[in-house]
From Swiss-Prot:
Pfam families to which the protein is assigned, alphabetical: GIY-YIG, HHH_5, UVR, UvrC_RNaseH, UvrC_RNaseH_dom
Keyword match DNA damage: yes
Record key words, sorted: Cytoplasm, DNA damage, DNA excision, DNA repair, Excision nuclease, SOS response
Family membership: Belongs to the UvrC family.
Main location per the UniProt record: cytoplasm
Gene (UniProt): uvrC
Official protein name in the record: UvrABC system protein C
Highest classification ranks of the organism: Bacteria, Bacillati, Bacillota, Bacilli, Lactobacillales
Taxonomic source organism: Lactobacillus helveticus (strain DPC 4571)
Length: 600
């Protein structure tokens, strides 16, 4: 249902291309979209019945902004910029990077080959990415042996060890002719582009010779080299009749979800494939979600553009090609059309599997979280945050925060807090101070950084923790976030939520959850997770401080020497096991090393 503000703004919408930013009650941008006609697109959110994820979005919209542009290309680029800036909840968020390594030939006066996960526009040559990291490492070592460039750190006035082994051209002690480097680089590029027949034949002969001479370890080593070369360079059968680097995109839509399949063709082989699936915010225009995904996909760090992108029919290929700066084509027949159809079949297969798993998992995640919000009489929220404290008789106090989004842990958002100072002993006052400090630090920072607030805070404790948390939120930070306590029974088992709104005349009361419900299981899981996280952090901190204290008690070992030992060995056990020479290698003098051995 559109508010009066939205109704008034809808009348002023222009019939121009551009982007729109949907905002919630807090003014947070929750969705960014683009359209060739802003008037028609934005009005469609409020003038027709919505279902699925789009219905959820519309229920949360309280305002919107628009930005007009001149062309579709500008709308594409602006949409990606806005999504990166605001990271809206209802937009698909792509993870950065592939996680796979590349083999790089560096662009330097004395070039070298190396593995890297970062692709830069520095004029170097990049090959990959390679899904099998171990095979990529082994292939790199093979290249460095057979096609040497530079393996040392550069000129040092004398030949390096690798030069004597035939794995360095000698930049360590002389000027290597550029022609020599160019010839080697040409061979490496030919090898990594799939021309490996001669190399394989040579290795096979050497393996057979080693076997005939009963050098079985050497034969096995060569056999492994052949296997790794096949993993990285020759992994797939040839499925194309040219060597053009291509990425193939196709998609399938069902039940307000889109599944996108990507095939990566390199050296005429299917190197690997990826599948991405996400719920559609605008079910009426899946084509827009598909093209936006492609632009975002190549906007990620370490994504290397191919020479050509293939997509199905029905899209503005010219605009997409202009945005990506590579040709975008739609094959009509032949082998490329077959690959495009295969990508769609795979997208459908993956989505069908997803639905079967969703039916099982949704009851335990999003459905379970809804049960908690329903029990508290709150509208559904996506983010729950929970705190717990840990210390031993007041020593080394810490707090931990866990975050659950739609019923699942978001471990990238977990946080650890070293509490300032030490408390004398554990009592209610200490819990109050710990709670106030960590709540102030957490949500004060979110305010300063204009980050999204959680929809519910669960404190691991009773009224003391809830009151302390609400006092800081409302009276210091001017925030109105619902806070509930997870209350345990006399057997230390969670059995109720403590919730209310005393400021508005609603006293705190115990709210039971059905012990057999998914909501109860989720609450227990959140409490177990925050307790585990806090205890683990405290144990590590306490062990580290105990080790520091033990070292500080040794005469002649000051803070600098202590830190050297901690960096080198990490634990008291390893320091005890270290020899005097090992201790000296860590940076201690001979008398210091002897004293440490004697005292420990």
């Amino acid at each position: 249902m559109a508010t009066q503000l939205i109704e008034n703004k809808l009348k002023l919408l222009p019939e121009k291309p551009g982007c729109y930013l949907m905002k919630d009650i807090n003014g947070t941008v929750i969705y960014v979209g683009k359209s060739k006609n802003l008037k028609n697109r934005v009005r469609s959110y409020f003038k027709s019945k919505q279902v699925g994820r789009r219905a959820e979005l519309v229920r949360e919209i309280r305002d919107y902004d628009i930005i007009t542009v001149s062309t579709d290309k500008e709308a594409f680029l602006l949409e990606i910029t806005l999504i990166k800036k605001y990271q809206p909840y209802y937009n698909v968020q792509l993870k950065q990077g592939t996680g796979y390594p590349y083999i790089e030939i560096t662009r330097e006066h004395d070039p070298q080959t190396r593995l890297t996960s970062i692709v830069c526009k520095d004029g170097g040559y990049y090959f990959g990415p390679y899904p099998n990291v171990y095979a990529a490492q082994a292939t790199l070592k093979f290249i460095q042996k057979v096609f040497p460039l530079r393996r040392c750190h550069g000129y040092q006035g004398r030949p390096c060890l690798y030069y004597h082994m035939g794995q360095c051209l000698g930049a360590c002690f002389k000027k290597v002719p550029q022609k020599e480097y160019d010839e080697q680089i040409k061979k490496i590029k030919r090898f990594l582009n799939g021309d490996i027949g001669a190399v394989k034949q040579d290795l096979t002969q050497k393996m057979e010779q080693a076997s005939e001479q009963l050098e079985f370890e050497r034969a096995a080593e060569i056999r492994d080299q052949l296997k790794y070369i096949e993993e990285t360079v020759e992994k797939q059968k040839i499925i194309s009749n040219d060597n053009t680097q291509r990425d193939i995109f196709n998609y399938y839509v069902d039940k307000s979800w889109i599944s996108i399949q990507i095939f990566f063709l390199r050296q005429a082989k299917l190197l690997r494939r990826e599948t991405r699936m996400f719920p559609l915010t605008d079910i009426t225009d899946p084509e827009d979600a598909f093209t936006s995904f492609i632009v975002q996909f190549y906007g990620q760090k370490n994504r290397v553009l191919p020479k050509e992108v293939l997509i199905p029919a029905g899209f503005d290929n010219d605009t997409l090609a202009e945005v990506l700066t590579v040709p975008v084509r739609t094959p009509q027949r032949g082998q490329k059309k077959s690959l495009l159809d295969m990508a769609k079949d795979n997208a459908k297969l993956k989505l069908d599997d997803k639905f079967r798993l969703l039916e099982l998992g949704n009851r335990k995640t999003k459905g379970a979280q809804k049960e908690i919000f329903d029990a508290l009489g709150l509208p559904y929220g996506h983010i729950i945050e929970s705190f717990d404290h840990s210390h031993i008789q007041g020593a080394d106090p810490v707090s931990a925060l866990v975050v659950f989004k739609d019923g699942e842990p978001d471990k990238t958002a977990y946080r650890k807090y070293k509490l300032k100072g030490e408390v004398e002993h554990q009592n209610g006052g200490d819990e109050v101070r710990n709670t106030r400090e960590v709540v102030r630090r957490r949500y004060g920072r979110l305010l300063r950084e204009h980050k999204k607030m959680p929809d519910l805070i669960l404190m691991d404790g009773g009224q003391i923790q809830v009151d302390a948390c609400e006092d800081v939120l409302r009276n210091e930070l001017n925030l109105n976030i619902p806070v509930a306590g997870m209350v345990k029974d006399d057997k230390h088992r969670t059995n109720h939520l403590l919730f209310g709104d005393p400021i508005n005349g609603v006293p705190l009361k115990l709210i039971p959850l059905n012990p057999k419900s998914e909501g109860f299981y989720l609450m227990t899981r959140i409490q177990d997770e925050v307790h585990r996280f806090a205890i683990t952090f405290h144990r590590r901190r306490h062990a580290k401080n105990a080790l520091s204290s033990r070292l500080d008690s040794i005469k002649g070992i000051g803070p600098k020497s202590r830190n050297k030992l901690l960096r080198k060995f990490g634990s008291l056990k390893k320091i005890k096991e270290a020899s005097v020479d090992d201790l000296r290698a860590a940076g201690l003098t001979l008398p210091q090393a002897q004293t440490v051995k004697l005292m420990l």
